[in-house]
């Protein structure tokens, strides 16, 4: 039985993510047809989107869903790579998933204890880029920004991964580089896949990241085209660098909570491989959200 997070349970409709293997993938994803979620909003309710067969406990970690195209449907599905959910659950958290409409209302009523900004392909605000693209921010990016504002206002622990790291940085005035792989050979590329241990990163001392992983160097995966520019950091500081000086992790100069961290690699996938640093990142994030640290 679902334990709703507020006294206004009548405003919620309980929705469970389902599994699917998209034709272009070799793994099973979580998904929901977008039309199903839109119908909940049309009825004047809010979706309470969770995993099946997982008990609702604290801490709740809010996650904006991704999108994926299924050939049988005109509109993109809401989707989620399974490793994000698994990392939260394995670390003792309860993931609650947020759709792109009425983001603030969903968050205010689910009352998360922390927020996770996941990676993915979407359009960030064009004025964040050193070389602005034609397209401006899309609906997914707008949802991320709304959730990030909610986290700031409510002083919630925040973890950003890949594009989520860039959202944290861009919102604090950092500039983005659009195609960091343009001048790289294959061996240097930052887009080698989620489970490939591709390159080392140097963890800078006296940072939250150094405190969490307790290492000065990490071996990480890499799957990105964009990155925060080293010379335009806004109100952020660098927490980790690749050998080619690509920014690999950032932290705000004035964090709204003692745990606010963005990493460019994908610790949720390395956690699946048993990586200890990745385990510590998620474990610390979830424990802080539970007020246990």
What annotation goes with each model-predicted range?
Residues 222:
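Short, basic/aromatic recognition patches
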Residues 2-159, 170, 177, 181-212, ...:
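N-terminal beta1-alpha1 cap of cysteine-dependent amidohydrolase-like domains
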Residues 261-264:
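Active-site-proximal beta-strand elements of phosphoester/diester hydrolases
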